[in-house]
Amino acid sequence: MISQISRRSFCVAAGVSATLVALGGAGALTAQGAMLRPPGGQDERAFVAGCTHCGRCVSACHARAIGAASLADGLLEARTPVMRYNLGFCDFCGDCARVCPTGALRPFDVEAASAGDVDACCIGKARLSREICLAWTSSSCNLCYEECPYEAISLDGDGHPVVDEARCNGCGVCEYVCPVLSLRSYIGGTARAIAVVPVSPGEEEVGR
């Protein structure tokens, strides 16, 4: 029975893969863009090689900031952990890395990372879209500046928020509190004005 189920599962997976490739080419199997991984998983090649899609890191995140990638993110990436800053933000507690059974999420210095040391851990960098940012287009919203726990966002002479990427560790607080998506949803808005994007190992050194 087990072998029958295994063969059936293999056939189903093969069929899905073939269909996706036929519909979207080889790109349907892989991510359509860089993935924002939990802390300790920024080396994408090493992470993908080690991740077993077990979901333990998702369950361990007390802030609910870790979710599972979907098929839309690529067949090979489906069910791998990604940061979902619409649900919460990262405080670098290290629980996700501690429960990872394979080391795909590498351990990091929790105390240093929690204090804002980007050398200890850097998930990504916050990027601001000025064209939809309330502070840059109409009102005096400064929530991202007020809530950033690492002083990685400052205000320019006109009161507009500006991200200091050298200080940003990608915690996601700014993205979590940004009200733009809610306010623009009635006109078809699909994104917040500030969002954390992944960086490759070493890329965070740029701008220091």
Tell what function each PLM region has.
Residues 1-208:
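Non-ligating segments of multi-cofactor redox enzymes
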